């Protein structure tokens, strides 16, 4: 495993941990809030942003190895 892959894995793990804690806090806010629609919107935005960030990090980690594999496939 390359150091870059390890870094991506650590970032994804901490992002997931942060997302779980933030979701727990926002769900408590949703229960006690008078404006539940705003709290639900915040929860949705944070969840989508975190999932897209993790997906982008995984994609950019796998992209160079996939590109290198295609180069090897076409030239050798």
Curated annotation (Swiss-Prot):
Residues 56-76 are cytoplasmic. The chain crosses the membrane at residues 35-55. Residues 1-25 form the signal peptide. It comes from the Eukaryota. This is KANTR integral membrane protein. It is found in: Membrane. The lineage of its organism: Eukaryota, Metazoa, Chordata, Craniata, Vertebrata. Residues 26-34 are extracellular. GO terms for cellular component: membrane. Keywords: Membrane, Signal, Transmembrane, Transmembrane helix. It is a single-pass type I membrane protein.
